[in-house]
Amino acid sequence: MISKKLTTALLILFTSFSFAQEEPSVEKSIFGIQTGILGVWVHNEARLTNSIALRTEIGLDFGINGNDNTTTTALIPSIRVEPRWYYNLEKRIAKNRKIANNSGNFLALNVTYNPDWFYISNRENINVISTVAFIPKWGIKRTVGNHFTYEAGIGLGGFIVLEDYETDTNVALDLHLRIGYTF
């Protein structure tokens, strides 16, 4: 009698676990490196909610400036904070697609600070202007294998020059294509 009740209880317990579905969620924390045509970055994505992650990033952004006589290229430091809303995780799960390493489509607000602390350039004594950019954007991120990622995104916003000598309205375009590795 006890074994029959125990068997029935275990059967109900295992059945209820098999029907319980976990809600799709971004990863608790992801650390990685990325590179693209326009620089190299180290990043972390931390879960805020099941579909929102806060991406923090430091790196070197590539810049180019040219005129008739010379072309100047430079790598300048960047510090980025970017809340991301991964809006299609449930749809990806329903289609048996990966959401590992936060693979999915996202909407974000990119806030980037480019200080004039230092630069790496092909020319001496260039003028690096400190800026802060605010750019809403759309993007995709995908995982290949277990650790390799690629992502693309586009956004249009504005930036503020932190020196006193410029008061114009500035438009900023964020267009990125990156490959990376997550640890």
Where are these regions (language model features)?
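Membrane-embedded beta-strand positions of outer-membrane beta-barrel proteins
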Residues: 31-35, 56-58, 105-111, 136, ...
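Short loop/turn motifs that connect adjacent beta-strands in outer-membrane beta-barrel proteins
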Residues: 21-27, 51, 88-104, 144-148
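Bacterial Sec-dependent N-terminal signal peptides
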Residues: 1-27, 179, 183
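Transmembrane beta-strands of outer-membrane beta-barrel pores
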Residues: 37-39, 58-64, 85-87, 111-117, ...
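Transmembrane beta-barrel domains of outer membrane proteins
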Residues: 34, 43-45, 84-86, 139-141, ...
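Outer-membrane beta-barrel "beta-signal"
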Residues: 77-94, 171-183
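Residues that define the transmembrane beta-barrel architecture of outer-membrane proteins
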Residues: 25-31, 36-38, 73-79, 128-134, ...
